[in-house]
Design a protein with these regions (language model features):
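Peripheral (non-transmembrane) domains and long loops of multi-pass membrane proteins
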Residues: 49-51
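Nudix hydrolase/Nudix homology domain
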Residues: 21-25, 86-147
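Hydrophobic alpha-helical positions that pack around
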Residues: 28, 42, 46
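Active-site-adjacent beta-strand/loop module that shapes the phosphate/pyrophosphate-binding cleft
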Residues: 63-87
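Active-site lining segments that contact anionic ligands and/or coordinate catalytic metals
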Residues: 54, 60, 70-74, 90-91, ...
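N-terminal strand-loop-strand
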Residues: 1-27, 31, 53-58, 77-79
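Surface-exposed, charge/polar-rich loops and edge strands
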Residues: 36
Length: 147
């Protein structure tokens, strides 16, 4: 399975499922289909769940995942902020700036995944990133990519 931190460098895409605890938000995730690379899965799953087109994708980390006894592969993916068209898999999805996300977390209006989850780790990695960490997403042409 894959889980992805989708960002334009300044905003992050988070979603929530109706079955989750109230106020819980997380990253989008999905299962790899036969014949598909993990990177292709990231692009497909983000599109299917949110209608957002992803550009560059890079692997970050993995975590053993108990259901269905597998491995969760964590990715970062570039996508310029764009309108969201949620699928029936999600109750809601939204782009959040670092300032917005910090405020919602501090007020208790948004709950992150459990502290030991790869989802939480990827969100905090993005939230704590400084300008030097965001260079990856900017090119001379103004589109996402590696310098």
């Amino acid at each position: 399975a894959v889980i992805m931190c989708v960002s334009d460098g300044e905003k992050i895409l988070l979603g929530r499922q109706a079955t989750w605890p109230e106020k819980r938000w997380s990253l989008l995730a999905g299962f790899i289909e036969p014949g598909e690379s993990p990177e292709q899965t990231v692009v497909r799953e983000v599109w299917e769940e949110s209608g957002v087109k992803v550009g560059h994708v890079r692997y970050v980390a993995s975590q053993p995942w108990p259901m269905p006894m597998g491995l969760m592969l964590g990715f970062e993916a570039y996508a310029p902020e764009q309108p969201i068209a949620i699928s029936d898999e999600l109750q809601a999805a939204c782009w959040y700036s670092r300032e917005q996300l910090r405020g919602l977390i501090a007020s208790g209006d948004l709950l992150l995944p459990d502290a030991l989850s790869i989802s939480r780790s990827l969100i905090m990695r993005w939230l704590d990133a400084g300008p030097q960490d965001r260079v990856f997403w900017h090119t001379e042409a103004g589109k996402g990519g590696q310098p």
